[in-house]
Amino acid sequence: MAVSRRCVLVYALAPEGMPAREANDRLNEYVADSRRGLSVWHDHFIGAHGGAVVLDVRSEEECALLDDRGPLEGWDLSVHPLTFSLSAVGFAAQTSFTLESYRGVRLEELAAAETDDPRFWWRRRSA
């Protein structure tokens, strides 16, 4: 992929039989590797082990590492450049745009209406 400043979605499924803990650790190692670009977002899957990562790819070196699976060697990996998320800020803007345009709600409104669920780790971080 030629570098054209934009975010990419990396979709990664661990090999059959890999324990969830190991899959989570390997995905986190991939996310933590700053050589791959700016890690904008990631999450892990329930059920099939693996996860997804959004990277803001800003250089030829970062782009080249999209072909290097690193700790995800042996995984089913697919990389998809995103249309409107041209940077980390663009990814955040696209999130807000989608909520507001397709559901008529702002992220701040959703945050204000959330209950005190102990699973909501992001509420502990902002307290």
Sequence positions of predicted segments:
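Small, basic N-terminal interaction modules of short regulatory proteins
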Residues: V54
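Short S/T/G/P-rich N-terminal loop/turn motif that feeds into the first structured element of a domain
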Residues: M1-W41, F45-G50, R58-E60, T83, ...
